[in-house]
Amino acid sequence: MRTRVKFCGITRREDAIQAIRLGADAIGLVFYPESPRAVSPQQAYQIVRELPPFVTVVGLFVNAASCYLQQILDKVPIDILQFHGEESPEECGYYGRSYIKAIRMAEGVDLPSLARSYESASALLLDAYQAGVPGGTGRAFDWRRIPKNFSKAVILAGGLTPENIAQAVRQVRPYAVDVSGGVERIKGVKDAAKMAAFMRGVDSVN
C-alpha cells in the first residue's frame, strides 16, 4: 500500500500549491495560537480556496475550546480534525467529523490501550515526546516501539526529514507520514527543494 504524505504547518498559499504539485495527499493548518506556524481563519480560507479537488485539508487543534473550534469549522472547509492535546475520545468525536488523535510517545505509552480508547479515530498520529510541547519538536522517537500489526492506521511524525524518510517508511510501513519542520526554511515557511527531496524519499520506497 502506498504511504500517503501530509505537509503540516502550511502558512502560505504558495507552499500549499507546491505541496500538491509534488504529489502530497494532504496539508495541515495549525489553529493553535502559541505555535509559530499558526494561521488565522482568514489565512486558512485563502489557502484552502486555492486547492484543487481531492486534496485533504487537516485542521490541527490543541485543547481548543469547543466554541473556538466551531468558529473555525464555520469559516474554513476542513476535512479532518487533528487533536494534539489531552482531548478525550468524547471531545474528539463531538463535532461529527473524521479525526486523527496525536499520541506523544512518552515512556510507558500503551498504544494498544489507546487504540481501544480512540476506536472512533480515523488514525493515530505518533509523535516524539517533549515535556510541555504538544508537537513540532523536530525530534524522532524509536520507531521500534510501534507494535507490529498494530490495529489502527498509523501516521508517523516527529523528526522526519528528507534524509531519514525512506528508512522510516521502510521500517514502519505507516499509512501516512506527517512532516513540518523537516522541510522548512524557517518556521512556517517551507523549502521547495526539501519538500521535493522528501517526496522522492517516500516514493523510493513506495
Curated annotation (Swiss-Prot):
Record-level Gene Ontology MF annotations: phosphoribosylanthranilate isomerase activity
E.C. code: 5.3.1.24
Record's keyword terms, sorted: Amino-acid biosynthesis, Aromatic amino acid biosynthesis, Isomerase, Tryptophan biosynthesis
Keyword rRNA processing: no
Gene source species: Nitrosococcus oceani (strain ATCC 19707 / BCRC 17464 / JCM 30415 / NCIMB 11848 / C-107)
Family, as annotated: Belongs to the TrpF family.
Single Gene Ontology BP annotation: L-tryptophan biosynthetic process
SUPFAM superfamilies associated with the record: Ribulose-phoshate binding barrel (SSF51366)
UniProt pathway annotation: Amino-acid biosynthesis; L-tryptophan biosynthesis; L-tryptophan from chorismate: step 3/5
Cleavable signal peptide: none
Main EC class the enzyme belongs to: isomerase
Reactions performed catalytically: N-(5-phospho-beta-D-ribosyl)anthranilate = 1-(2-carboxyphenylamino)-1-deoxy-D-ribulose 5-phosphate
HAMAP family: PRAI
Descriptive protein name: N-(5'-phosphoribosyl)anthranilate isomerase
UniProt superkingdom: Bacteria
